């Protein structure tokens, strides 16, 4: 088994960015991570990521430049980025590739995530207690 190390990190600032999509913010974060690692996008051999708001987060590799790398879509609510990082690390650990990148990206409107938390398996009392609200700016 191969050792795994995080060699670069990128983060888009938190906040409200009118006119900028979640995918565009994800691209900025991924480019920052690649630069932080001292690499080029063409050095990345695989990616994993997910999003609540973007139905096709794998399309982000096309925004960065199609290089033919595999992209694993994950969805695990607020733990999606952590699940993507684990999927990426597992691929490296198992020897599938040497350099991977993980991304989690979302852009929520102000207020409740959905009108009905039951749509995502949450009980109604979750919303009734005010526990289903996005951060307000």
Task: Put a short name on every predicted segment.
Residues 1-75, 90-94, 105-137:
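Conserved "HGTGT" condensation-loop signature of ketosynthase/thiolase-family condensing enzymes
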Residues 81:
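Short conserved active-site loop signatures built around small residues
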Residues 98-99:
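Short acidic donor-binding loop at the edge of a beta-strand
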